[in-house]
């Protein structure tokens, strides 16, 4: 498939797009001499003409191959005497018109073009040979699959009012196939078999290429829809739907009966944001414990932060610190005396001395030797009582 040109015609005409693709050598050369191996480019032009009402309507599908005249496939609202589909062929200037109808039903555009290059070197085939080739194609066992594959391509991205018509036309075609009772034996023409298989595979691949971008767009919009609904749940907003229930079916994407049977009825679950569950749990806990949290916050706010000690108490502690700088470890009796003079409790006094020693005191070398040698505590009492007479000057605290 070299290119795809999907341009919508005027809405009043109800036409579908044009699609351009390259056919395989075998498919494009059926009915031609085997010496020609060029790759044919086939152009499909599907148009609708005429209006509704009692007068009937007609639709035309034009197909053209390189070096040949366009081949027109057309359906009109005509009725045969026996109520069966009627096929008419006009062979003027190599233009072929296929007219099909059934009793009691309004016709819908469903045509399948088999690209037949009916030129053999410089000589055209006779009308009888053309009719024989077309009859072989219609009678081929693969013909019904080819029609269904073509209709599946038409369903991809079709408007909501066209999809039901396509479904009805497909059911009518299947009913006519069953009622005709035509025996479809195994084909004995290998070239025709390969021709039918090549075009069937081409239509299947064409449908997959059409479906992929539309399906990706639908998945993206579903994810956006899910995320918007999650954001709106906090405000108790009604759920948002980007697609209506009819559009949510992707307008025929992946709706072929074969795929539905193979899928086992499973539907694709839209992707969910992994953080949505955490947010939902957070909101639930806030709603349940918001009262406790607010009361706890108020209780904590009432507690004053611990401030500095009174200035007078700090001055008394610093005076004791300067007198006992060599060994600033007050005894229990001294702590009680300091507590009475400063008005502080022993815990505050202990904390003040711990912080003061960490910040402003370092044992002298003599004191370190005394601790290492394990001297008698009576010698250490000299430092505690202030009787140690040394030349080292005291360092005043802040």
From Swiss-Prot:
Residues 49-58 have a biased composition (Gly residues). SMART domains: ELK, HOX, KNOX1, KNOX2. Signal peptide: none annotated. Residues 280-300 form the ELK domain. GO terms for cellular component: nucleus. Expressed only in the stems. Residues 43-69, 172-192, 234-277 are annotated as: Disordered. It is found in: Nucleus. It comes from the Eukaryota. Residues 301-364 bind DNA. Gene3D superfamilies: Homeodomain-like (1.10.10.60). GO terms for molecular function: DNA binding; DNA-binding transcription factor activity, RNA polymerase II-specific. Belongs to the TALE/KNOX homeobox family. Probably binds to the DNA sequence 5'-TGAC-3'. This is Homeobox protein knotted-1-like 1.
């Amino acid at each position: 498939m070299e290119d795809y040109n999907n341009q919508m015609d005027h809405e009043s005409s109800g036409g579908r797009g044009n699609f351009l693709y390259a056919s395989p050598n075998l498919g494009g050369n059926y009915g031609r001499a085997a010496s020609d191996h060029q790759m044919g480019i086939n152009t499909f032009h599907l148009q609708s003409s005429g209006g509704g009402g009692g007068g009937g309507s007609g639709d035309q599908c034009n197909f053209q191959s390189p070096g040949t005249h366009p081949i027109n496939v057309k359906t009109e609202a005509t009725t045969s005497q026996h109520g069966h589909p009627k096929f008419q062929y006009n062979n003027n200037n190599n233009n072929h018109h296929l007219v099909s109808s059934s009793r009691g039903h309004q016709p819908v555009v469903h045509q399948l073009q088999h690209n037949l290059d009916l030129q053999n070197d410089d000589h055209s085939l006779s009308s009888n040979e053309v009719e024989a080739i077309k009859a072989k194609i219609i009678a081929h066992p693969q013909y019904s699959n080819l029609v269904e594959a073509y209709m599946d391509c038409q369903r991809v991205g079709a408007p909501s009012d066209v999809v039901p018509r396509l479904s009805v036309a497909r059911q009518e075609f299947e009913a006519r196939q069953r009622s005709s009772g035509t025996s479809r034996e195994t084909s004995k023409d290998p070239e025709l078999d390969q021709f039918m298989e090549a075009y069937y595979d081409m239509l299947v691949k064409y449908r997959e290429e059409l479906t992929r971008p539309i399906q990706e767009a639908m998945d993206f919009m579903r994810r956006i829809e899910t995320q918007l609904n999650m954001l709106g749940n906090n405000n108790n907003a009604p759920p948002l739907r980007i697609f209506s229930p009819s559009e949510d079916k992707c307008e025929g994407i992946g709706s072929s009966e074969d795929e539905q049977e193979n899928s086992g009825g499973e539907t694709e679950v839209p992707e969910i944001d992994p953080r949505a569950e955490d947010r939902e749990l957070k909101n639930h806990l806030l709603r349940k414990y918001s009262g406790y949290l607010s009361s706890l916050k108020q209780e904590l706010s009432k507690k004053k932060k611990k401030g500095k000690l009174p200035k007078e108490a700090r001055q008394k502690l610093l005076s004791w610190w300067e007198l006992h700088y060599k060994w600033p470890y007050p005894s229990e009796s001294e702590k009680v005396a300091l507590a009475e003079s400063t008005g502080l409790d022993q815990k505050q006094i202990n904390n003040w001395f711990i912080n003061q020693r960490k910040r402003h005191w370092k044992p002298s070398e003599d004191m370190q030797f005394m601790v290492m040698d394990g001297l008698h505590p009576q010698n250490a009492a000299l430092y505690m009582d202030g009787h140690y007479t040394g030349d080292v000057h005291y360092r005043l605290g802040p």
